[in-house]
């Protein structure tokens, strides 16, 4: 009888490591997520932009367009940037022509438009695609749970905002229609 009991206990413990291995691999998924600091992109002037230079700063990544009903958000983005740029916060704009061809211009035309109409001084990157088969790798990172460790999501429209912490990890996604000075964005920036 003792042998049967001992064998039962032994079998029970023999089965447990598989569960432990499974839960251990599930628990390690977040450690496999990427940081935006791993990316190097091209800015609107054709120069290399290394996101690792932003370590220690909170980052807002936003896809932009010049001929969209939300284009006036450039004004709010610029005001937000000027208020917090000296407090370890930066906005990175990515022009994209994915929604109703609302960003048809060249990089030079986009830069001129942003400067002339909104005084944009936050870093603007070269025009990319934020969805579909031509999606830029940085947006694959932002929209894929396997890469960002937060969630799968889609860019819904121009001016969708991605908030990343000082380590470059995605923390929050803000809908396009939410203004840059929205209380939830301000709270996130100011949170220690």
Residue map of PLM features:
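Sec-dependent signal peptide recognition
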Residues: 1-9
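C-terminal motif of bacterial Sec signal peptides marking the signal peptidase cleavage site
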Residues: 13-14
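N-terminal "domain-start" segment that seeds a small globular fold
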Residues: 20-52, 72, 136-137
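Amphipathic alpha-helical repeat scaffolds
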Residues: 43, 63-67
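Proline/glycine-enriched tight loop/beta-turn segments at coil->beta junctions
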Residues: 54-59
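Structural microenvironment flanking redox-active thiols in thiol-disulfide oxidoreductases
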Residues: 70-136
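Thiol-/selenol-based redox modules, centered on thioredoxin-like
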Residues: 137-140, 144-192
């Amino acid at each position: 009888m003792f042998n049967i009991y001992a064998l039962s206990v032994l079998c029970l413990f023999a089965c447990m490591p598989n569960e432990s291995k499974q839960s251990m691999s599930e628990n390690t998924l977040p450690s496999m997520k990427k940081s935006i600091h791993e990316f190097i992109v091209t800015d609107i002037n054709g120069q290399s932009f290394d996101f690792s230079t932003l370590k220690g700063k909170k980052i807002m990544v936003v896809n932009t367009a010049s001929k969209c009903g939300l284009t006036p958000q450039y004004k709010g983005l610029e005001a937000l940037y000027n208020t917090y740029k000296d407090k370890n916060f930066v906005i990175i704009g990515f022009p994209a022509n994915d929604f109703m061809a609302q960003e048809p211009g060249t990089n030079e035309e986009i830069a001129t438009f942003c400067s002339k109409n909104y005084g944009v001084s936050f870093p603007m990157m070269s025009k990319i695609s934020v969805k579909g088969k031509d999606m830029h790798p940085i947006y694959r990172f932002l929209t894929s749970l396997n890469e960002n460790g937060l969630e799968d999501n889609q860019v819904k429209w121009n001016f969708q905002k991605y908030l990343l912490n000082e380590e470059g990890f995605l923390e929050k996604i803000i809908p396009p229609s939410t203004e840059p000075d929205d209380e939830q964005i301000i709270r996130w920036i100011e949170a220690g």
